[in-house]
Swiss-Prot record:
Main location: cytoplasm
Biological or metabolic pathway of the protein: Lipid metabolism; fatty acid biosynthesis
One Gene Ontology biological process: secondary metabolite biosynthetic process
InterPro entries: ACP_syn_III_C, ACP_syn_III_N, FabH, Thiolase-like
ACP-binding: annotated segments: 253-257
Molecular-function annotations in GO: 3-oxoacyl-[acyl-carrier-protein] synthase activity; beta-ketoacyl-acyl-carrier-protein synthase III activity
Catalytic activity line of the entry: malonyl-[ACP] + acetyl-CoA + H(+) = 3-oxobutanoyl-[ACP] + CO2 + CoA
Gene name as annotated: fabH
Entry keyword rRNA processing: no
The name this protein goes by in its record: Beta-ketoacyl-[acyl-carrier-protein] synthase III
Family named by the database record: Belongs to the thiolase-like superfamily. FabH family.
Amino acid sequence: MTRYSRITGTGSYLPPHRVTNDDLVAQLAQQGIETSDEWIVERTGIRARHFADRDVTSSDLALEASRRALEAAGCQAQDLDLIIVATSTPDMVFPSTACILQNKLGANGCPAFDVQAVCSGFVYALTVADAMIRSGGARRALVVGSEVFSRILDFNDRTTCVLFGDGAGAVVLEASEAPGILASDLHADGSHVGILCVPGNVYGGQILGDPLLKMDGQAVFKLAVGVLEKAARATLDKAGMTDADIDWLIPHQANIRIMQSTARKLKLSMDKVVVTVDQHGNTSAASIPLALDHGVRNGQVQPGQTVLLEGVGGGFTWGAVLLKM
């Protein structure tokens, strides 16, 4: 019998501290940096984001999102036999945030590890979990994207500090006789490392290089709009489907312009795109599961519908997953 995997529950969590554009404008003005709500909205579509308190970690956010996903799936943490966390802002250098989350959930014993593909991280992690379930290596997996990007932002750079927020999203992925994950397509091109990175490191207890986020926005935009269409079409081809079969597009919530461009290339109305970037900002690996959970809980995404997830991020990494809810 062919074995498949299917999402049986979704969950998400945003830290309570909500920062509007006006809040950020006022903060930056105190540092002599000029920007405006209009400037941010016009270029990004972002109106607000959430920042975690100083003592809150990625695993803390992941814990809340995971509990909600487990509840939605009707299972307990002890039922898990795999945990994968996608994050670029781990609690520690090691052990993995997944191991820390596993302990907080009380799911000790199952394999747990992190995936680091920045904003493509959740798509990568979901693909790995699907492969492990299909091969018989797992039966019920928890796949999480969780980030505290506010820790690595340069608040002297108005072009980047307004873009990102903190949050977590999670799904429970279970073995199924009916196809859930239909196809996926992953890519990376390390020749573009410098256009989106945090170029710092730790050596002998000292920080080497720059520990804050750097981005060439124009280069990222140009590359993203091209590779996202290619990944989408490759994934659809693998599943024997076309643009017309997509009920919902859930892209990485980076920038409304990138999302609009991707939808246009796939001949999709924006009415078929789940958009949360306006309220959450770019939450990196958390953005896709956050948006998916939002779509499920507000009644947009219905059982049986076909959903295309797309991620693109530093590395440069990108990919897509086509699934049936």
